[in-house]
Amino acid sequence: MKINLQIADYRIRLTEAQDYPAFSWPMHPFGSFLDRSDLHPDIVITITVVEKLPNFSQGPLRFDACQGLWRLHETDAGLLLVSLDTRTHQPCALALITKNFSHMEVWTLGEQTASGKGWVPMKILNPLVEVCLLTRLAREGGLLLHSAGVLSPTSGYIFTGQSGAGKSTLSEFFNTDGASVLSDERMIIRKSGDTFLIHGTPWVGSGAFAKNESGPLTELFCISHGAQHRIDRLSPSAVLALILPQCFLPHWDRSVIESTMACLSDLIAHVPCQRLTFAKQPDVVDYIQNQLTRTTLVAS
């Protein structure tokens, strides 16, 4: 079985050669991220369904995600990712990852149901594909940001903030207003020429918004709830202090931290970044658009 995905212009191919059934697939919203082109993949993942995981010697620990999620160890062949079952905290999948994060060989425990033996693609996508994609993205000057993303015919907005800051709420309001909500939880930002582009991802928040679309980023807002709507300018240092904690960083690859900081500095220098405090009222959509229109008229 083959599964081809496209996320933020990265093509990812999963191949399970034994052709076991894939359970709970495609799970929403990954269906809209399926890639039906024949273009060469950027990340290749080969999967073997097994009764028992192979025994690999685990070298020095590179990263521990804690909370019973996964660990990354160094090996002579690259990196070994140990994915843990969230219920038993025992390994349920192993993956050997090449040093350039373009190939991954995976062994996953089979799942037994009344209809027979199979495998669960979501146990490969989370976290194995995320690790490869995040590393490649950071190495190539992109960002995965804890944020919502919205496209209108003339604008592209990012709303970033900690959990509970209002990303899904704003997404609901903009969706009702007819805008295209790319995600209410995680957005990818990549630069194309002189333009920063925002890309939807299949990782969703409470609103379950996800679209495989992209467009130019025109405004970035650091958001929080308040008694009334208000937009305030921020200094570059203040923007960085608010955005950095919302970035998903590949802490297992310290070589990319410098490039990530350079990407953030470039973004802050070229895209208007402001603080948005808003009351939980739908008219915040009109407020934002009116304030930005007024600012544009004053500037011109």
Please describe what each predicted stretch is.
Residues 1-158, 162-163, 176-180, 187-300:
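A noncatalytic interaction/capping subdomain that flanks phosphate/NTP-handling catalytic cores
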Residues 170-171:
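Post-Walker A alpha-helix
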Residues 165-167:
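Conserved glycine(s) of the Walker
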